[in-house]
Amino acid sequence: MRVTVFGIGYVGLVQAAVLAEMGHKVACVDVDADKVAGLKEGRIPLFEPGLAPLVQRNHQAGRLIFTTDPARAVEFAELIFIAVGTPPDEDGSADLHQVMTVADTIGRLMQGGKVVVNKSTVPVGTASRVRRHIAERLADRGLDLPLDVVSNPEFLKEGAAVADCLRPDRIIIGTDSDHAFSLLEELYAPFNRKRDRILRMDARSAELTKYAANAMLATRISFINEMATLAEALGADIEEVRKGIGADPRIGHHFIYPGCGYGGSCFPKDVRALIHTAKEAGCETPLLRSVEQVNEAQKHRLMTRLHHHFGASLSGRTFALWGLAFKPNTDDMREAPSRVLMEAIWAAGGKVQAFDPEAMTEATRLYGQRADLTLCDTQETALQGADALLVCTEWQQFRAPDFDLLRQTLKQAIIFDGRNLYDPARLRQRGFTYYAIGRGDSLAHQEER
């Protein structure tokens, strides 16, 4: 099948590469000429495990092409995917400028019937809006061509996107058109062999499903973080509580790990967009507002601990920071807790020596050169001369460090752990002062000192 994907960012590039791997002919179109040129030369513009060889292999095989020519891409395709960004507007709503620009392009250029598939995360009603817009452009040209617009939301996890795309747990196809559904059913047949993963519904329900799924996961994170705050106040250990409630099969262990807050390109944006959508529909969403409020407060928890230990001013203090990306196995720093923490440290007069296995280039892009930030080549280098270690991201290589080296290298044997990676009792035996999230034992012992 011939497929065009508009947008070669995180969602579009993964989708295109996986479809090409299944044997489809895929054209990727983007307005960024440098990005297109880089992909033609084998340079991948983002870090995602397994993506680079997938892109390079299928490009070399001729199944995956990259272009800045939208006319060529529209003419090429039976199916056209829209996979462009929908960044948050100032009021929290999703900015649909890029989506509607693609719709305008399709309407101006299509010469025959098309099925347009929206992969971008968009508000309810966007499929209808895109269809109307394309139809208007066709009418301007005096054309009335067959057209279907389908909602086909993505459910990829950054850091596991290729695996999620190759082995989806569900494929939602939102359309009332039997023709469009049949085409997508054929497209996704290689992913649907062992069991039927396809869920057909109307487009509006498909659009809401995407937002509801992310809001549900964000709610679980904020819930466990609120319980962590209570555990601290009561002298309980949230890690034991987590195991206890997770053992209930109705709850399970997914997304109940306490920490210094969620970030990334999806959860913060989508919760706000859903709140905005509900407001426009005249619905109150006190639960969703609380989810967002708890998360924003959680991102400041480590800073509160720093002030508790070192005082209001951090002037003359330097902190080692492990983990800049919002989660492991990605270089994405969008709304990452590390950014909130670093910026608060700088505002209090402190300095940061940071290390992340993948996000150093992104940190340089965001912050440039500044005297209060040193980006280090290794996690050990970041420790040198630091007053304490701060952990913001649970990369595997941070889970079992050389604690003897750590204690010898830091000025003071202090760890502020935003991901609960370490055992408080063992660290105490090694002579560390240890602050974690929701581990009342770790805090109680510091207060006794």
Residue ranges and their predicted role:
Residues M1-R449:
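Structural/interface elements that position substrates and couple domains in central-metabolism enzymes
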